[in-house]
Amino acid sequence: MWKHVKQVDPEIYEVLVNELKRQEYGLELIASENFASLAVIETMGSMLTNKYAEGYPQKRYYGGCEWVDRAEELAIERAKRLFGAKFANVQPHSGSQANMAVYLALAQPGDTIMGMSLSHGGHLTHGAPVNFSGKIFKVVPYGVNLETETIDYDEVRRLALEHKPKIIVAGGSAYARIIDFKRFREIADEVGAYLMVDMAHFAGLVAAGIHPNPLEYAHVVTSTTHKTLRGPRGGLILTNDPDIAKAVDKTIFPGIQGGPLMHVIAAKAVCFKEAMTEEFKEYQNQVVKNAKKMAEEFQKRGYRIVSGGTDTHLFLVDLTPKDITGKAAEKALESCGITVNKNTIPNEKRSPFVASGIRIGTPAVTTRGMKEEEMEEIAEMIDLVLSNVTDENGTVKPEVREEVSKRVRELCERFPLYRDKIEGVEI
């Protein structure tokens, strides 16, 4: 593998090998990350990257599209079957592009949209002031009840009645509970708004049938394909409404994108096929079991879990009682081979660059085959590290760093990732 890269560009070859080592021998707990199969990776690295295919299958602006048409048709049909949708657009380059396409298809610049506040668990593209969504549209953020730390649906309704948004966005990037899509649709209908659900984080759980399918209530659903879905980096838009489908297609192309990434679209097709297997359903069930188990283990060790637990693949740990910042925790854990991300918590007092919490997700470690027993071990190691941070820069006592780093390596060696499947690369 990568023999041609090694010959042509030794510096990039070094990057590839070192990143492979990092993934192989480190514990990946960032909730938005996962490990794609070699089938997905091979497809992404194929000659399909050479083909321009502006337009849609059978309606291209270029010749020579017979086989890329077939790839996109497979991706569309599989996405529709997987999620029970009548229409699917598989061309968005990312989840952000998918969200932008829906906004521009259903609203005009200056219209009002409602989305979950970033500090309460939402996403940048749900109306954050620094994002295009917050610059193009008037944004009314909603949040969680500060006591329960779950969505305050009464407040969502009050805000919707007051501001009459064109689009209400449900979904988030750091919200651990199942969302009441029915309630959101009732609110949307009451004010004449479209309901858009961003299921980027929990799409894999939906595909496996262990999480409510937002398409039952949403006018339109967006997603990424690389988180719990375990596919290539990219976006997806689903709907059952032919008029919305038409508007979305026109907004993606020629509205905000030119040539689609055919190597990625083909890899999406592979990912959707993998997601239809019984093995994938078992995997997603284990992802949730692992998240619940690890959250419980943190609670046993005196940590506060935002909203008291999780229904999904992720949870937020409030580090305030431990007198350590999210920034320091992230750095400390990374020095020991454990990757998490700092995260704001509801009623956050610190800047998002420092934050009071960390977000933890189990998709990647579950892909390795780890189960509840390993979650207990991981929680114990994280607690050991965070209990031995000596300063605000996340410095860990040397003996603890050495011990945990060794244990992380040993655990990863027990659950190999790519090591036994890749030829020609020494790691």
Curated annotation (Swiss-Prot):
Q: Which reaction does it catalyse?
A: (6R)-5,10-methylene-5,6,7,8-tetrahydrofolate + glycine + H2O = (6S)-5,6,7,8-tetrahydrofolate + L-serine
Q: Where are the transmembrane segments?
A: none
- Asked if Ubl conjugation is a keyword of the record, the answer is no
Q: Where is this site: Plays an important role in substrate specificity?
A: H226
Pathway named in the protein's UniProt entry: One-carbon metabolism; tetrahydrofolate interconversion; Amino-acid biosynthesis; glycine biosynthesis; glycine from L-serine: step 1/1
Single GO MF annotation:
glycine hydroxymethyltransferase activity
Question: Is Amino-acid biosynthesis a UniProt keyword of this protein?
Answer: yes
What the entry lists under SUPFAM superfamilies is as follows: PLP-dependent transferases
- Sites binding (6S)-5,6,7,8-tetrahydrofolate sit at L118, G122, H123, L124, S351, P352, F353
Entry's EC annotation:
2.1.2.1
What highest taxon heads this organism's lineage?
Answer: Bacteria
- By its UniProt entry, which Pfam families does this protein fall under? SHMT
* Alphabetical keyword list: Amino-acid biosynthesis, Cytoplasm, One-carbon metabolism, Pyridoxal phosphate, Transferase
The subcellular localization recorded is: Cytoplasm
User: A GO BP term, please?
Assistant: glycine biosynthetic process from serine
What is this protein's function per UniProt? Answer: Catalyzes the reversible interconversion of serine and glycine with tetrahydrofolate (THF) serving as the one-carbon carrier. This reaction serves as the major source of one-carbon groups required for the biosynthesis of purines, thymidylate, methionine, and other important biomolecules. Also exhibits THF-independent aldolase activity toward beta-hydroxyamino acids, producing glycine and aldehydes, via a retro-aldol mechanism.
Supply the PANTHER family for this chain.
SERINE HYDROXYMETHYLTRANSFERASE, SERINE HYDROXYMETHYLTRANSFERASE 1
Looking up NCBIfam families in the UniProt record yields: PRK00011.1 (NF000586)
**Family according to the record:** Belongs to the SHMT family.
**Assembly and binders:** Homodimer.
HAMAP family, from UniProt? SHMT
What name does the UniProt record give this protein? Answer: Serine hydroxymethyltransferase
Give the source species. Thermotoga sp. (strain RQ2)
Instruction: Please state the gene responsible for encoding this protein.
Output: glyA
